[in-house]
């Protein structure tokens, strides 16, 4: 059943729940790899730097998706963009799970990151259509699920990899993206394009916005530094935890 949504008229609780779930599962794609880097290095017989490129390229892909795919939501049907991204994300995750060459993992990780930007469609959608009295609550729910996906994905991938190997993490993730596609296919309305400008002009407008609002520049710089520090910790932690004195036999 496809929901009919109008600006500021409220969003059904069932749709909010589904969008929240999809938000957490989508962003998780960018973070499954961080606890798995040591296992990947051993499996592909590459050094730590080559394995760490998997995490780096995933984040580079996510940045490119935010920069170049999200603006397309003003020019094209967001429903079609979201569904297309889910298909591409599922395929790239499956490719990582089946890869026998680290270079395939690099390319697929870049695509995974770029196509896992669905939360940045969902959160504005919820804000735009929620009733004024519920906007902050609903956006808070969506942001909470985003953070649960970011943090919980690392725990989940570590547990799955410990039980069935790191490749199983990506097979399950591909299945979850297929599930999200089916869920969004059934419930998302058309969400037609809202702008009539060209893609080039839309991209130029991003630069004008950045120049016009100094607080945006400050907030962006702070977020970049905080996120960089956070990523630096997690991307290196997997390698350290596979060395003494953190080995299971030494801890026990």
Where are these regions (language model features)?
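Paired small-residue
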Residues: 92, 103-111
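Extracytoplasmic
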Residues: 18-48, 119, 233-238
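Helix-loop-helix hairpin linking two adjacent transmembrane segments in secondary transporters
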Residues: 104, 141-185
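Pair of pore-lining "gating" transmembrane helices in MFS-fold secondary transporters
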Residues: 12-32, 213-229
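Cytoplasmic helix-loop-helix junction between adjacent transmembrane helices
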Residues: 109-144
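Juxtamembrane intracellular "pre-TM" segments in multi-pass secondary transporters
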Residues: 2-9, 189-220
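Residue-level signature of mid-helix packing/kink "hotspots" within the transmembrane helices
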Residues: 31, 59-67, 117, 150-151
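Conserved MFS/SLC helix-loop-helix module at the cytosolic interface between two early adjacent transmembrane helices
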Residues: 64-100
């Amino acid at each position: 059943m496809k929901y009919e949504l109008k600006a500021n008229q409220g969003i059904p609780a069932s749709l909010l729940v589904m969008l929240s779930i999809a938000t957490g599962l989508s962003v998780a794609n960018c973070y499954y790899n961080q606890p798995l880097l040591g296992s990947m290095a051993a499996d592909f017989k590459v050094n730590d730097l080559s394995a760490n490129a998997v995490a780096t390229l995933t984040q580079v892909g996510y940045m490119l998706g935010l920069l170049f795919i999200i603006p397309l939501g003003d020019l094209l049907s967001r429903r079609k963009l979201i569904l297309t991204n889910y298909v591409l994300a599922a395929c790239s995750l499956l490719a990582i799970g089946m890869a026998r060459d680290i270079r395939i993992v690099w390319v697929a990780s870049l695509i995974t990151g770029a196509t896992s930007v669905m939360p940045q469609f969902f959160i504005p959608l919820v804000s735009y259509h929620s009733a004024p009295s519920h906007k902050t609550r609903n956006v808070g729910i969506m942001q909470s699920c985003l953070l649960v996906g970011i943090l919980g994905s690392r725990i989940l991938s570590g547990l799955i990899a410990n039980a069935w190997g790191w490749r199983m993490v990506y097979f399950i993730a591909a299945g979850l993206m297929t599930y999200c596609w089916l869920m969004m296919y059934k419930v998302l309305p058309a969400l037609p394009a809202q702008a009539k400008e060209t893609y080039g002009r839309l991209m130029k407008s991003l630069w004008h916005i950045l120049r016009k609002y100094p607080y945006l520049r400050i907030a962006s710089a702070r977020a970049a530094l905080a996120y960089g520090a956070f990523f630096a910790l997690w991307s290196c932690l997997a390698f350290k935890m596979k060395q003494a004195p953190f080995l299971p036999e030494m801890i026990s």
